[in-house]
Amino acid sequence: YPLALASIVNDGWSLSSLHCQLSGFLMGLSVIGSVFNITGIAINRYCCICHSLRYNKLYSSTNSLCYVFLIWMLTLVAIVPNLCVGTLQYDPRIYSCTFTQSVSSAYTIAVVVFHFIVPMLVVIFCYLRIWALVLQVRWRVKPDNKPKLKPQDFRNFVTMFVVFVLFAICWAPLNFIGLVVASEPASMAPRIPEWLFVASYYMGYFNSCLNAIIYGLLNQNFRQEYRKIIVSLCTTKMFFVDSSNHVAHRIKRKPSP
């Protein structure tokens, strides 16, 4: 967060209003994009596991590209109204330009409902249906003429389920605060402790750091790639250390004129 660091050093926003709007816009784009992508992945896992016979038709290469395009177009449409309502402002509590919950009660409620609650309900529905199928397979009550649950599909489902749970836990406090503030901005906004808002804000953005850890713990392919990266970095470091030692040794052995 270079801009946040600059704000901390300067004790305030030192760039133009346009930069502030752009910064808040990009941050909002990433957050809403994450919500919609998690929802899209949940629907994908639901179709793959619960409707596997129709999955290849539903998620052909062309259709998959259309789904990705649709998700990001919806994300763009969802974030643009912030520029019209004027909710992207500098918040000195977090030294960042972000969504201001107290500007418009109706808009804040709409954001929380359509950008968090509704997508989370869709994801919960998809994962509950998948878990029901998993339990059927585990207890062998699933008819033999239905599609079977593949181990790889189950592992991918568990990974994305954990990602969703952590996302919901990390972002729920900030959205709950938004609903509280939107209920009565004039009276409720000052009653929210600053430390609570700051903690919930950074807790939400800390979720992005957790994803890499979750993928590494639950996905073998990620673990292998992490191992390659670590080995490569260690090898490169050892190479530079050995080269530096060799050069230093040659300088010491070189006779002085």
Curated annotation (Swiss-Prot):
Keyword check for RNA-binding, yes or no.
Answer: no
Where found? Cell membrane
Its BP terms in the Gene Ontology are: G protein-coupled receptor signaling pathway
Membrane-spanning parts: 23-43, 65-85, 108-128, 161-181, 195-215
Principal place of residence? membrane
| Cellular component GO terms, alphabetical | plasma membrane
Concerning Pfam families, the annotation shows: 7tm_1
Q: List the disulfide bonds.
A: C20-C97
Q: Name one GO molecular function term.
A: G protein-coupled receptor activity
According to the UniProt entry, the coiled-coil residues are: none
State whether keyword Cell membrane applies: yes
InterPro entries on file: GPCR_Rhodpsn, GPCR_Rhodpsn_7TM, Mel_1A/1B_rcpt, Melatonin_rcpt
User: Which keywords fit this entry according to its UniProt record?
Assistant: Cell membrane, Disulfide bond, G-protein coupled receptor, Membrane, Receptor, Transducer, Transmembrane, Transmembrane helix
Residues on Extracellular side: 5-22, 86-107, 182-194
Q: Gene3D superfamilies, alphabetically?
A: Rhodopsin 7-helix transmembrane proteins
Per the record, the similarity remark reads: Belongs to the G-protein coupled receptor 1 family.
Biological role stated in the UniProt entry: High affinity receptor for melatonin. Likely to mediate the reproductive and circadian actions of melatonin. The activity of this receptor is mediated by pertussis toxin sensitive G proteins that inhibit adenylate cyclase activity. Possibly involved in sleep induction, by melatonin activation of the potassium channel KCNMA1/BK and the dissociation of G-beta and G-gamma subunits, thereby decreasing synaptic transmission.
Mind telling me what this protein is named?
Melatonin receptor type 1A
Q: Which organism is it from?
A: Bos taurus
What gene is this protein translated from?
MTNR1A
